[in-house]
Every structure is written in structure tokens, then in C-alpha cells.
Amino acid sequence: MAVIHFNEQGFDKALANGGLMMVDFWASWCGPCKMLAPTIDQLAQQYEGKALIGKVNVDEEQALAIRYGVMSIPTVIYFKDGQEIDRKVGVMPAAAFASVLDANL
């Protein structure tokens, strides 16, 4: 499954549906965000049917970035059953992101 690009309405709907979600808050001008993009795509395929992997463009969806206190990008926030359970800031190997997903499946 491809990465889901969320707007605020789609994000809120996905969050309300519960389950495990990993969301990358990013911007098109952000170099580290561009470096992280292939990792996010890989995780979306790897966890298809197990977790929802999405992205939020902070320039287009500023209200979401403010709501979750995103001050640096890339910021990856994990949600389970509608609640934030973890977050990671910066570029990391896929295994670092996967470990949080695996621990919460």
C-alpha cells in the first residue's frame, strides 16, 4: 500500500478509526525529509494491513502541525487507538521506526 497523504479531515478520520498509525510530518523544502521519504515508503509496504503509514505536509496542514507541537521536521508520530504513543525527530534507519511499530502491533 502506498503512503497516505493526509489533509486535516482525512487525518482526523483515520485517527478516529483507531488501530496503529505512523505519521511523518514533513515539508517539500526540507532536505532531511526528502532523505527519509524512501524509508517511509518502504515501511508502508512492509506494514500493509498491519499499520497505517501516512504523511502530513506541514506547510499545507499547519493546524495539524500546531495541534501536535511539531517544531522540527521530519517528525514521525505514532498513534494507537487515537492516542499518541511515541515520536521520533530526524532521519533514522528504517529499523528505528519499525521497532516502535513492532512493539505496538
Predicted regions and their residues:
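Conserved Rossmann-like nucleotide-binding pocket used by diverse enzymes
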Residues: A2, W26, L52-G54
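A short beta-strand-turn-helix
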Residues: V3-M21
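Structural micro-motif
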Residues: Q62, Y68-I77, M92-A95
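Non-catalytic, surface beta->alpha helical segment in thiol-disulfide oxidoreductase systems
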Residues: Y78-L105
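Conserved redox-active cysteine motifs that mediate thiol-disulfide chemistry
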Residues: F25-T39
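Conserved helix-turn-beta segment immediately C-terminal to the redox Cys motif
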Residues: G18-L20, A37-V56
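Short pre-active-site segment immediately N-terminal to redox-active cysteine/selenocysteine motifs
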Residues: G19, W26-W29, S72
